[in-house]
From Swiss-Prot:
The protein, known as: Putative arrestin-related trafficking adapter C2D10.04
GO molecular function: calcium ion binding; protein-macromolecule adaptor activity; ubiquitin protein ligase binding
InterPro entries in alphabetical order: Arrestin-like_C, Arrestin-like_N, Arrestin_C-like, Arrestin_domain-protein, Ig_E-set
UniProt keyword terms in alphabetical order: Cytoplasm, Phosphoprotein
Amino acid sequence: MRGELNIPALSRFGKSISASLHHQNGSSRDDNDSNPYENRSSNSGLNRRNSVFGLPSSGLSSRLSKPSLSSINNSNNSSSNTGGNVLPNPALTPVRNMSNKPPLTWSPSSANLFGTSKVTSIIGNNVSDVVPPVIKKALASSHGGGMSLSIVLLEPVLYLAGFDLNECQIENPALLRGALVLRVAKPANIRGISLSFTGRSRTEWPEGIPVKGHDTYEDKVIISHNWKFYEPTMKDADAPQHGADVARLVGEQLPLPSSAAASLRGYSVFAPGEYTYNFDLAIPNCFPESVEAKMGWVRYFLEATVERFGTFKSNLNGRTPVQLVRTPSPASLSSSELINISRDWDERLHYELQVSGKSFRLGEVVPITFRFLLLDKVRLYKLSISVVESSEYWCRSRKFHRVDPKRRVLLAERSAKHQNTDNLFETPDEGDGLSSAVFNFNVALPTCLVKERDRLTFDTTYKYIKVRHRLKALLVLSIENTENPEKRKYFEINIETPVRILSCRCVKDSTLLPPYESSSQGDNQVLLPCPCRLATTHVEPTEVTAFTTQSVLASSAPSAGRPAAAQISRPAQLFRIPSTNPPPFDGDVCPPACNTPPPNYDELFDVLSSISIQDCETDRANDDTILNNRVRRSGTIREEAPHRSLSRTVSRSFEIPR
């Protein structure tokens, strides 16, 4: 038993060495007996540290402790007395001999790791000064606060372009980009880090599937994609960054075992720091958008999981939603093409309805114009504008179908105070064909913050949930009753046209390119709150994300740089194609005067004609010279025919003997 060392790796109290070692190292025994509790605590603490890191006790303690000169001499003397076969036991080094500046992995201040502690190392694929944004609230954290998990999205809202299949195939797909941020305050044993992107849909069927069936809903998985960021079996599993794209490590780092040891143990030790794992995924435009209907929904979310090693260590799970918004294709004219309806009613009234577009977002103001031309004695008592919403649901591969009752939301209404005497036309009902009336409305669509009975759902493209809208105008008219002049005949005219309602997040600054004259790039920021909420509440600076890409605040508030004349709303009948940012009326600037007048074509024609005549004379002289040379060479002289420049006789070739 000479030199035998017995240090249990997981012992609660250290029985440090055997009796034979005490006999051979008397000096060390005397020092140890002077303070047995100190030795016992140091041995047990180091042994537990060895069991965590999977290292021999001698190698680890020599790196963590700084023994004094007397202890080194005593160890050398003991080794020389035993013939050099017994190595000194560094685990017996007292705690008082350790350096005054221990590593941060042992420091209690590491619990406040991301408060005032200093980052001493940054490890990444590309070393740069880019630091991940500060996360306001973690999605998941451990019980003691030693580990937290967060998901940062570069674009919190993704826009899918196109409502038709052809438009979806032409446009580029949306790109989901972000980072998973893992913060570790003290060394932790981790078995795996993964992230999944999932899209699910559900339709509610209270009457059962089929009718009086047991199933009252149907769930479907639209997409499921997984990322494996870290596994113990991966290459370089025990590297300092553990597969992270950017790793910000805190304190002095200890050398860790090889990847083979991590694969055998089934976990790796993550040093204190912040680990960032980037991810991206292309989402085709043919995918359904996020929907929250009355009897169904479509939702997308990212779910991160951190598997921890240990008996009483629970896994960290965090989930964050991802919104997919459907927008018209940039090549589509639905937002700029006008709706014009022109009809005649019983040869008594000619009316026109004009709407400045075919697609509008929730909360947007829609200009609507009515024009009337009186052909007879007609009175108008009521004029109302509303939106009618129809919803349809399918399930079991579209075998079962349900149509919900239509919902009508009133937008604007104008009526006469006294139905018998008043008239909205405000003109005597002469019916001479010359009197007319025009009504302009600025109708505001309801936002997503209104009451449930007045709330609208935007149009959907999902094949199991269909929501459509129609704009409806109601006219209440009256004419004279020839049979009873004291009473009038009343009629109702319904005007309907399909319109497309978009999500409230389809603001111009998010779906269109920014103006070229904007020089400041830092002002365009993505705001997580809904634009409907921005119009009613004040947005705090903390709600603005750290990534600057787009803006929705500019669409909800008038621009301060534009003149007051540009902010005045124009009637819809004054322009054919409405602009998203029209200039003021006096904003047109005349082009500069042209300082180069056109040339004098008479002189130019004379010069060109003289040049053409000289060219003809030169060509004729050249032909005569060639002909004389050929005649002299043959030896025969023939009488040449006179030149006829304007004759149409058939030319004959000269007979030259050969």
